Amino acid sequence: MTLIMHSSLLLIFFILVYPLLTTLNPNQQDSNMAGMTKTAVSSAFFVSLLPLMIFLNLKTEGIITNWQWMNTQAFDVNISFKFDHYSLIFVPIALYVTWSILEFALWYMHSDPNIDRFFKYLLTFLVAMIILVTANNMFQLFIGWEGVGIMSFLLIGWWHGRADANTAALQAVIYNRVGDIGLIMTMAWLAMNLNSWEIQQIFALSKNFDMTIPLMGLALAATGKSAQFGLHPWLPVAMEGPTPVSALLHSSTMVVAGIFLLIRLHPRMENNQLALTTCLCLGALTSLFTATCALTQNDIKKIVAFSTSSQLGLMMVTIGLNQPQLAFLHICTHAFFKAMLFLCSGSIIHSLNDEQDIRKMGGLFNIMPATSTYFTIGSLALTGTPFLAGFFSKDAIIEALNTSYLNAWALTLTLIATSFTAVYSFRLVYFVIMGTPRFLPLSPINENNPLVINTIKRLAWGSIIAGLIITQNFPPMKTPIMTMSITLKMAALMVTIAGLLVAMELANLTSKQVKITPMISTHHFSNMLGFYPMIIHRLIPKLKLTLGQSAATQLDKTWLETVGPKGLALTQMAMAKITNDITRGMIKTYLTIFLLTLILATIPVLL
C-alpha cells in the first residue's frame, strides 16, 4: 500500500513539474503555459484521490525514504515522505482548490502580458506546499516552508509598477523572516541535542529533554507564517496582489503552513503547558483583534483577509486546547469557503471596473445572481451556519473550548471573536448584495463566463458538503464530550445570532457616503487597525530616528567640537597667548624672565 501511495505522490510531482520543465526550452513557440498548468493540476487532483481512497479503506499510514541526501557519522539527512491522514487529506484539498483558482485566473488575468509566468509562479508555489505537507523531516519541511515564502513575495508584488504592491511584498517577506528565525533556531537546537531532523526520531529521542525552547521557536515560526498577533500586519496588506493569489496563498494554503507545522510536531507539544498556553492565548488574542479590525473596513478584500487571520487565530486556539485534529479539520473546511469568498470578490471587483469599496456596491443580487448566491453561501459557512462546511469544525472547536476547563479569558475572547465573525460577514453581504446599486451604471457587468461560474460552483459544493464528508471519514483522536448542557451546546449558534443582530445595527451606523475619515469616534480603533501599524511602522522608526539624531548631535557637538578640536584649540590659544606676550617688546617682561633665569641658574651653584 505504501508503494501505491509513494508512486502516486511521485506521479503528482511529475505532472506538476512537467509544465515548469517545458518553459526551460529557449525556442518554444506560442506556449500555452496557463492552460497546461490548469490541466496538470486537475490531473494531479484525480491521481491524489487514489492514495486517499486506499487510506480511508485500510487506515494504514506509511513512511518511505527514497534517497540519502547527506550522511555523516552522527547525522543523516534523507528525502523522506510521510503518508498519514494529514498529508493524504490535505494534498487533494490543496489540488482541488488550486485547480478552481487557476481556472478562475485564466479569466481574471487574461489581459496580463505575463500570464504564463504568473501561472508558473502559482505552480511552483503549489509544488513547494506539497513538499511541506508530505515532508517527514525538518530539512525537507524547511525547503517547502521557504519555497512558499519566496513565491508569496513574488506573487504579492506581481504588479511591481505600483509602490503599494512592492511595499506589501517586502512587508510580507520581512515579517515571515522574523518567524523563520524561530524555525531555524529550533532546527539548530534539534541538530545539536538530538542529532536528527527525522520527525519520528525527534519524538522518540526528545522524551528526556526540556522542549520549551524549541517549542517556543516553533510557536514564533507559526506566528510569522500564519499571521498571529504581533506579526499579523502583512496579511491584510498582501491583498495588493492579484485576487487569485489572495485566494490561493492567503486563504487556503500558505497561511495555514504555520498551523500545519504545529500539528505535525504536536506530540512533543501536548505535554508542555507553557507552549499550549502560549498558543491558546495568542490564538484568542489574534482572533478577537483581527475580527475587530474587520468590523468597519470598507475594502472587500481586506475584510475577507482579516477574517482569514481571525480563523487562523481560532486554529491556534485549537492547538492550545490539545486538539490538533480539530485544527486540521478547520484548515480543510476553511480552504473551500475562504477561497470561494475571494473568487466571488474578484468577480465582483472585475465587473465593477476594479472597485473594491463596498460602499460603492449594492444591489448585486439582481445583476450577478450566481456570484451573489455563492458569496452568501461562503459567508454563511464562515459564520458557522448549521450543516455547512464551517459548522462541523467551528462548532466542534467551540464545544471543545467550552468543556476544556482551561483559560476562561481565552474562551471569552474566542466567543466574542466568533460573534464578530457573524457581524462583519453579514455586514459584507448587506453592503455588497442587498439594497440598491450605488455604482456607476456604465460598469460592464457580465458573470456568464464558464471560467468564473464553474470554478466558484465547484468551491460552493465543497463549502456545503466538505465538512460532512471529512467528519464521516476522519474520526477524532479523542472522544468528544457526550454530556453537555444545552447552553454550552448552543453557545456558538447563539453568539452567531447575536452577531447578526449587531451587524444590522452596524450597517445602519456606517455612512454610505464615501468619507476619508470616519465620523463615528467608536470606529477609529477598528479603522486604524488597532493603531498597530502606526505604532510599529511609524512610531518606533520615528523614535529611533529621533534618538539617533540626538545621539549624533551630542556626539558632534560634545566630542567633535567642545572636547575635540575646540577644546584643544582653547588650550593651545591660552599657551600661545603666554608665549605671544614674550615677543611684544615689553622691557619689564624681558627683565623678569632674565632675573628668573639668573636665579634658576645660580641656585645649583650655591647649593
Swiss-Prot record:
It is a multi-pass membrane protein. It is an enzyme of class 7 (translocase). Keywords: Electron transport, Membrane, Mitochondrion, Mitochondrion inner membrane, NAD, Respiratory chain, Translocase, Transmembrane, Transmembrane helix, Transport, Ubiquinone. The chain crosses the membrane at residues 1-21, 44-64, 88-108, 118-138, 139-159, 172-192, 213-235, 243-263, 274-294, 303-323, 326-346, 372-392, 415-435, 450-470, 484-504, 587-607. It comes from Cyprinus carpio (Common carp). It catalyses: a ubiquinone + NADH + 5 H(+)(in) = a ubiquinol + NAD(+) + 4 H(+)(out). Core subunit of the mitochondrial membrane respiratory chain NADH dehydrogenase (Complex I) that is believed to belong to the minimal assembly required for catalysis. Complex I functions in the transfer of electrons from NADH to the respiratory chain. The immediate electron acceptor for the enzyme is believed to be ubiquinone. Its main location: mitochondrion. It holds the Pfam family NADH5_C. It is found in: Mitochondrion inner membrane. Belongs to the complex I subunit 5 family. This is NADH-ubiquinone oxidoreductase chain 5. Its EC number is 7.1.1.2. NCBIfam families: NDH_I_L (TIGR01974).
